[in-house]
């Protein structure tokens, strides 16, 4: 899809989200994550499409779901999907659907999605520990690091980069690529777009009570810690990154600043900014 085409659809979606998130309706509960938690608790069991198989893997502190194509699976690469949710929302059916989409657009790559622990019950470093355990699981299953692609949106996109900082600092091999959609990379909320898009962001804007100001995950830790806010880490040696973000998002700076810093440090980065989204 061309960015111009996406922008037209994006404007329609933006206006719809802005209406739904009106504080007089249910906006506050959407923005602060309360509705997400309630929906997550009440979601019906997900029915896996017949073209896929889905296995649940129990780890010590969390579970994971491994989705595979039944016909012609791609055995060259595997995707580790890290879900979003502001580090306070557990995995939802939407991410099971995302796993299927990832499998389809990648011509059959399998997708591992950890339902990592979230705050406030499990603040930092729980999510990072579980993401690392999921990565190690793939290695233990015979995958090589150069076969692993890490994908994530929002908190999941930031967690993908935080995981790579952790892997590099601990002498581990990094994945072959990162796909990040609207990654949350600056939990210190210091970027320009936190102010310039405050009135325009239909999902998180116009309130300081939204998920992106929630401190449950950070706790008493330093928000400038690269394992919490990957923007502040050293990107040298990182794999190629694909970053996608909307121009109206408060998280725009999180993407733009990461892309600029990573490029300066020799990383191959492609960033797509979709106007009006």
Stretches with model-predicted labels:
Residues 9, 19-22, 46-48, 53-277:
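Alpha/beta-hydrolase superfamily serine-hydrolase fold, recognizing
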Residues 1-45:
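N-terminal targeting or regulatory segments adjacent to alpha/beta-hydrolase or S9 domains
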